[in-house]
Every structure is written in C-alpha cells, then in structure tokens.
Amino acid sequence: MEQNTDNVFNFSAGPAALPKPVMQQAQQELLNWQGLGTSVMEISHRSKEFIAVAEQSEQDLRDLLNIPDNYKVLFCQGGARAQFAAVPLNLLGDATTATYIDAGYWAESAVEEAKKYCQPDVFVAKAEKDGKQAVLPASEWQIHPDAAYVHFCPNETIDGIEINDLPVTDKPIVADMSSTILSREIDVSKYGVIYAGAQKNIGPSGIAIAIVRDDLLGLAKEVLPSILNYKVLAEQDSMFNTPPTFAWYLSGLVFKWLKAQGGVKAIEQVNREKAAILYNYIDESDFYINNVHPDNRSLMNVPFQMVKPELDAKFLKEAEALGLKSLKGHRVVGGMRASIYNAMPIEGVKALVDFMRQFEQENA
C-alpha cells in the first residue's frame, strides 16, 4: 500500500531528504527543460544553457555563504572521500605532515587516507564531560609546528558530535563540512579549504563542493590525478571532464530554495528550533537517552537510545508504518538517529516527538 507522501518524513543521514518544492520542480521539468524538448540530463555540459546553470549555482552558493572573491568554488566528483585524498595531495607541498583533529569516525577515515601521502599528526580531541561524550575545545588542540594544514570534521554524523570553535593558528584550516554546510552561518575567510559531499544539505549524491583559497592552488604534487587537482578544476570551471550535470542542476535548485527561505541565517534559526524540540524531549524523558554533552550536540544528527534497547526493532517498525523513515542508528553505535538537515520541516520533528511520546507511554 502506497503511503501519502505528505505524511512521510525522511530522517536519513544521507542520501538525505531534499526539499519537496525542489523535487516537484525537477519532476515538472524532467522531460522538457526550459522548452528545449529534452531533459537537463541530456544536454551538453558545454551548452550555453547548462553553462548558465553552472554559473548561477556558483553565484547562489557564493551569496548564501558570503564567499570572498579570493576563493574558488569547485564542483567535484567522488564525494567527500575523494577529498580525503585530494586535500593532502593538493596542500602538502614540500611538507611531510599535517595535523588531523580526531573527534570521530569521519575524521579517522580522513586520517587513514592521508597516511598514503604523508605522516599525519593526529590529535585526539575526544573527551568526556559530566559522563557524556564531548570534544576538547579548540584552544587545547595541539598543532604540529611543521603541519601544512589543520584538518577537522565539524560534525560527526554517527555519534552526533559537533565542534563549534576554531583554533587560532597560522596554518590553513581544512574542514569536512559534508553534514553542516549551509545549516548555519560561517566565516569562510577563516578557512583554507571547505569541502562537502552533497547528499545532506546540498543536493543528491554524486557531487561534492570544494571552496579553496586562491593561495593554496598550485601546490599539488605531480602524482595527483588531474581530476582531483584544485588548480586544474579551477582553470576548467569544474568541467575538466563531464560533470554530474543532473546533480549539479538539482544542487542549484536547492540553493535557490534556500535563498527563498531567507538564506542561511533564516534556516539556522529553524534548525536550532528543530534540534531544541527533539533534544528537550529526550532530556525530559526517562525512556530515551542522548549520550552527547549539550556543548557538543549536533544540530543535524540526533542519535538516541532507549533504556529498553530490546524495543529498538519495534520502535523502528512502528515509526516506519507512520511514515517516519530511516531512523535506524548507524551500525557502529546502534539505537536510533534522526538526521534533521535543512530540508526537514519542523512538522517532521514534531511528528517524531509525538510518536516517541506515545511509544514511551505504551512501553515504559
């Protein structure tokens, strides 16, 4: 039996929910885009029509994040994992090390890839505070004096841990913002490189964004594949080869949708309200638990467990039947996880809390 999509809320960590108006527009335009009689998926990436899409999407992203002129915006392939290799190969220059801040799974994944190209200096920032998971403040991070850059992941999706501050350093700061980009205001000028896989707050999977400061172009090692070379991509307007045009087009629609919501400042307020609704209920409950200290709780990914973990399967089955999708926690930590990215409306979070309250009453 088909579910009414009006009552379905997708809490997937990624690929994540896309704004419904974006999907509706893509559906309407799918077979005949801009009166061309063909789909946007079928036209040349070199055509004037698609060049206009590419240029407008870049400008919209620049507007949303207030990206300074001395930064290049690159639309890349291979997702964030490709950037785990691209970052050291583009930025090391003659250096043999870079500092990596380890606060969770994705930071550790970046370290493992970097080991192929250098000897990463790893600072473990994981901590415990009041019996909860936390992260050491950036002022306590130890940065190697010879580091080519400092890499960190501001939001660890699996544990639901967020880093909210930056170190004071003369080293370029590199951030994997796959799960936080466009969810709150940031000062791009404080970073050397920001990269993000698209499939959470930007668009569908298949594309990634890299925002690179101009002075960091041209440091690439000779062995770096051209498709990962920031300078090559910048010189070729991200079209060194055929890009994932449909994902690029959809990302552009998401940027326009976000501007129509009032931009990043407005969506940040909504995101904070959504997270507060969910965390407040969990904290008030004796049935649900979140193991992250409030100082480091993620705005985007809210993991929670029940005091009766044997009820997990029942919880997930009943939630699914009500249209509350993809709430199963990551296999590493178990339990449940609600990913509440930009496209998740407040109504979805309220529907989840209503279900959680009812489930608690029936099963406590």
From Swiss-Prot:
<dbReference type="GO" id="GO:0008615">
    <property type="term" value="P:pyridoxine biosynthetic process"/>
</dbReference>
<dbReference type="Pfam" id="PF00266">
    <property type="entry name" value="Aminotran_5"/>
</dbReference>
<dbReference type="GO" id="GO:0004648">
    <property type="term" value="F:O-phospho-L-serine:2-oxoglutarate aminotransferase activity"/>
</dbReference>
<dbReference type="GO" id="GO:0006564">
    <property type="term" value="P:L-serine biosynthetic process"/>
</dbReference>
<feature type="binding site">
    <location>
        <position position="106"/>
    </location>
    <ligand>
        <name>pyridoxal 5'-phosphate</name>
    </ligand>
</feature>
<feature type="binding site">
    <location>
        <position position="157"/>
    </location>
    <ligand>
        <name>pyridoxal 5'-phosphate</name>
    </ligand>
</feature>
<comment type="pathway">
    <text>Cofactor biosynthesis; pyridoxine 5'-phosphate biosynthesis; pyridoxine 5'-phosphate from D-erythrose 4-phosphate: step 3/5.</text>
</comment>
<feature type="binding site">
    <location>
        <position position="46"/>
    </location>
    <ligand>
        <name>L-glutamate</name>
    </ligand>
</feature>
<feature type="binding site">
    <location>
        <begin position="241"/>
        <end position="242"/>
    </location>
    <ligand>
        <name>pyridoxal 5'-phosphate</name>
    </ligand>
</feature>
<comment type="pathway">
    <text>Amino-acid biosynthesis; L-serine biosynthesis; L-serine from 3-phospho-D-glycerate: step 2/3.</text>
</comment>
<keyword id="KW-0963">Cytoplasm</keyword>
<dbReference type="GO" id="GO:0005737">
    <property type="term" value="C:cytoplasm"/>
</dbReference>
<dbReference type="GO" id="GO:0030170">
    <property type="term" value="F:pyridoxal phosphate binding"/>
</dbReference>
<comment type="similarity">
    <text>Belongs to the class-V pyridoxal-phosphate-dependent aminotransferase family. SerC subfamily.</text>
</comment>
<feature type="binding site">
    <location>
        <position position="199"/>
    </location>
    <ligand>
        <name>pyridoxal 5'-phosphate</name>
    </ligand>
</feature>
<feature type="modified residue" description="N6-(pyridoxal phosphate)lysine">
    <location>
        <position position="200"/>
    </location>
</feature>
<dbReference type="InterPro" id="IPR015424">
    <property type="entry name" value="PyrdxlP-dep_Trfase"/>
</dbReference>
<protein>
    <recommendedName>
        <fullName>Phosphoserine aminotransferase</fullName>
        <ecNumber>2.6.1.52</ecNumber>
    </recommendedName>
</protein>
<feature type="binding site">
    <location>
        <begin position="80"/>
        <end position="81"/>
    </location>
    <ligand>
        <name>pyridoxal 5'-phosphate</name>
    </ligand>
</feature>
<comment type="subunit">
    <text>Homodimer.</text>
</comment>
<dbReference type="InterPro" id="IPR000192">
    <property type="entry name" value="Aminotrans_V_dom"/>
</dbReference>
<keyword id="KW-0032">Aminotransferase</keyword>
<comment type="function">
    <text>Catalyzes the reversible conversion of 3-phosphohydroxypyruvate to phosphoserine and of 3-hydroxy-2-oxo-4-phosphonooxybutanoate to phosphohydroxythreonine.</text>
</comment>
<dbReference type="InterPro" id="IPR015421">
    <property type="entry name" value="PyrdxlP-dep_Trfase_major"/>
</dbReference>
<dbReference type="InterPro" id="IPR022278">
    <property type="entry name" value="Pser_aminoTfrase"/>
</dbReference>
<feature type="binding site">
    <location>
        <position position="176"/>
    </location>
    <ligand>
        <name>pyridoxal 5'-phosphate</name>
    </ligand>
</feature>
<keyword id="KW-0028">Amino-acid biosynthesis</keyword>
<keyword id="KW-0808">Transferase</keyword>
<keyword id="KW-0663">Pyridoxal phosphate</keyword>
<keyword id="KW-0664">Pyridoxine biosynthesis</keyword>
<keyword id="KW-0718">Serine biosynthesis</keyword>
<dbReference type="InterPro" id="IPR015422">
    <property type="entry name" value="PyrdxlP-dep_Trfase_small"/>
</dbReference>
<dbReference type="InterPro" id="IPR020578">
    <property type="entry name" value="Aminotrans_V_PyrdxlP_BS"/>
</dbReference>
